[in-house]
Design a protein with these regions (language model features):
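Short, Lys/Arg-rich N-terminal segment immediately upstream of the first membrane anchor
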Residues: 1-5
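Hydrophobic membrane-insertion alpha-helices, especially the h-region
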Residues: 8-24
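Periplasmic/extracellular, small/polar-rich flexible segments of pilin-like filament-forming proteins
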Residues: 58, 74-135
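Conserved hydrophobic/amphipathic alpha-helical signal-anchor segments
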Residues: 23-78, 84, 122, 126-130
């Protein structure tokens, strides 16, 4: 009676260890993909911010508008990011683009933080334009 009980305990322990190793391996891969997605999102936001600075606060309305920005050729993250991720371009230059990850993993809060940063930039540029206009 003692031998089958010991085999069951060993089998359960081995299965638990195997599940832990498999889970660790899977989550490590997801974390690495999330870091890559975050880098791509950051590169796109940097190009959008640069465009806005160069164009008096106006936001780009297409991917073609930011493709000529400095650093574009040296950053494969931007081109790859625009291919894999979604940027909902605004209909007018006073609205911020909205980023979406298309189901790709991202870091905790990355999309919300970057979209808030773009909205804040658009809001500042609209406030700055209306403050400069004569009454």
């Amino acid at each position: 009676m003692r031998r089958p009980g010991r085999l069951i305990v060993i089998a359960v322990a081995v299965m638990g260890l195997a599940a832990f190793i498999a889970g660790f391996w899977i989550t490590a891969g997801v974390r690495e993909r999330a870091r890559l997605t975050d880098r791509q999102l950051e590169a796109i936001v940097a190009a959008i911010e640069h465009y806005a600075r160069e164009h008096g606060g106006d936001m780009p309305q297409s991917a073609e508008a930011i493709q000529g920005m400095p650093g574009w050729a040296s950053s494969p993250d931007m081109a790859e990011g625009l291919r894999l991720l979604t940027v909902h371009w605004p209909p007018s230059p006073d609205l911020a683009p909205v980023l979406a990850a298309n189901g790709r993993p991202t870091g905790l809060g990355t999309l919300a933080r970057l979209n808030a940063r773009l909205r804040s930039l658009a809001r500042r540029s609209v406030v700055g334009q209306t403050a400069d206009e004569p009454s």
